Each structure stands twice: as C-alpha cells, then as structure tokens.
C-alpha cells in the first residue's frame, strides 16, 4: 500500500511539472504572436504616412 501511494504521488508530481512546462511554453508562444502583431502594426503606422506624403507631393507637382 505504501509503495502504491509513493508511485501515485510521484506520478502526480511529474504530471504537475509537465503541465507547468506546457503552460510556460504556451505563454511564450502567445507572447511571440503578440509581438509579431505589434510589429506589423508599427510597420503599418510608419508606412501609411510616408506613402500619403509621397502621393500628396506627386499630385501637388502634377497639379502645377
């Protein structure tokens, strides 16, 4: 009976560690996805004003 309890306790402990490691890995993946989305938003924020200024400048020159 004592051996069975030790075995079950060991399985519970190892399962808990395994779940903890999986959760950390999942959190790291979510952070990477969030960072990618933020970077894409930054690029869009930088890209559109530049394109707008270029188009405005071109149409301004063509209109003269």
From Swiss-Prot:
Q: List the disulfide bonds.
A: none
Please indicate which superkingdom the organism of origin belongs to.
Answer: Eukaryota
> Which residues get removed as pro-piece?
23-46
The entry's note on the tissues where this protein occurs is: Expressed by the skin glands.
The main place the protein resides is secreted
Instruction: Provide one Gene Ontology cellular component.
Output: extracellular region
Signal peptide positions are: 1-22
Keyword annotations for this protein, in alphabetical order, are: Amidation, Amphibian defense peptide, Antibiotic, Antimicrobial, Cleavage on pair of basic residues, Fungicide, Immunity, Innate immunity, Secreted, Signal
The record, for InterPro entries, names: Frog_antimicrobial_propeptide (IPR004275)
Gene Ontology BP annotations: defense response to bacterium; defense response to fungus; innate immune response; killing of cells of another organism
Q: Which compartments is it annotated to reside in?
A: Secreted
Any idea which residues bear Leucine amide here? 62
**Role played:** Antimicrobial peptide with activity against Gram-positive and Gram-negative bacteria and against fungi. Has been tested against S.aureus (MIC=2.5 ug/mL), B.pumilus (MIC=2.5 ug/mL), B.cereus (MIC=30.0 ug/mL), E.coli (MIC=5.0 ug/mL), B.dysenteriae (MIC=10.0 ug/mL), A.cacoaceticus (MIC=30.0 ug/mL), P.aeruginosa (MIC=7.5 ug/mL) and C.albicans (MIC=1.25 ug/mL). Also shows a weak hemolytic activity.
The family assignment reads: Belongs to the frog skin active peptide (FSAP) family. Temporin subfamily.
Name assigned to this protein: Temporin-ALg
What's the source species for this entry?
Amolops loloensis (Lolokou Sucker Frog)
């Amino acid at each position: 009976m004592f051996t069975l309890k030790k075995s079950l306790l060991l399985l519970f402990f190892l399962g808990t560690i395994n779940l903890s490691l999986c959760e950390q890995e999942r959190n790291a993946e979510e952070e990477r996805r969030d960072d990618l989305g933020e970077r894409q938003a930054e690029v869009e924020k930088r890209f559109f004003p530049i394109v707008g200024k270029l188009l405005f400048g071109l149409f301004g020159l063509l209109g003269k």
